[in-house]
């Protein structure tokens, strides 16, 4: 098999897997966004609980009401954080897969390029419905960097949550939904789908 055909075969297999992984990550992101909204609500309740004086009438008659409310809220918060971390772990798994896809694709490319089975001209040539090999390899690199960066940002946000500074914790959490969309490479993905459909019909 010539280098060009081998690379296209590898990239077709990888891109098919990439589509599935993007859906998996997008589902986790969507689910986590709902959890973040609930978490923000609980933090607001906890902040309000900390501000209220429970030593005056009529709240003074309820014993350790503040302590019991705080315990209930923090327990709910910790439970949500566990679920959010589970979603983040799913996204991290996807990021790891993308790193594997990029490495294995470049391995195939370098293997054939080093043996002279794939020229630079072949690697940079695109067809009517087929992106160039170079473009697809670059896209895989961008995808890997995008999801690695996304994981770092989400991890940083969760690490910034503290009960000692509830306003700052809320501020950090609001960044969760405003992070750059990892699917900003939609145009490239659309082109890849055309490529995959053409390969399937070939």
Model-predicted segments: where are they?
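Short, low-to-moderate order helix/coil transition modules at the start of elongated helical scaffolds
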Residues: 1-74, 168-202
């Amino acid at each position: 098999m010539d280098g060009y055909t081998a690379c296209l075969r590898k990239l077709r297999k990888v891109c098919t897997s990439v589509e599935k992984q993007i859906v998996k990550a997008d589902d986790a992101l969507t689910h986590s966004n709902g959890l973040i909204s609930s978490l923000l609500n609980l933090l607001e309740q906890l902040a309000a609980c900390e501000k209220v004086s429970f030593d005056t009438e009529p709240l003074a008659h309820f014993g350790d009401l503040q302590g019991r409310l705080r315990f209930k809220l923090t327990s709910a918060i910790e439970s949500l954080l566990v679920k959010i971390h589970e979603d983040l772990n799913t996204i991290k798994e996807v990021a790891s897969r993308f790193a594997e896809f990029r490495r294995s694709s470049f391995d195939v490319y370098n293997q054939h390029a080093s043996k002279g089975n794939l020229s630079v001209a072949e690697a940079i040539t695109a067809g009517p419905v087929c992106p160039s090999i170079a473009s697809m390899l670059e896209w895989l690199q961008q995808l890997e960097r995008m999801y690695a960066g996304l994981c770092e940002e989400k991890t940083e946000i969760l690490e910034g949550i503290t009960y000692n500074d509830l306003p700052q914790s809320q501020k950090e959490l609001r960044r969760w939904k405003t992070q750059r969309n990892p699917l900003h490479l939609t145009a490239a993905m659309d082109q890849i789908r055309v490529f995959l459909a053409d390969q399937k019909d070939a």
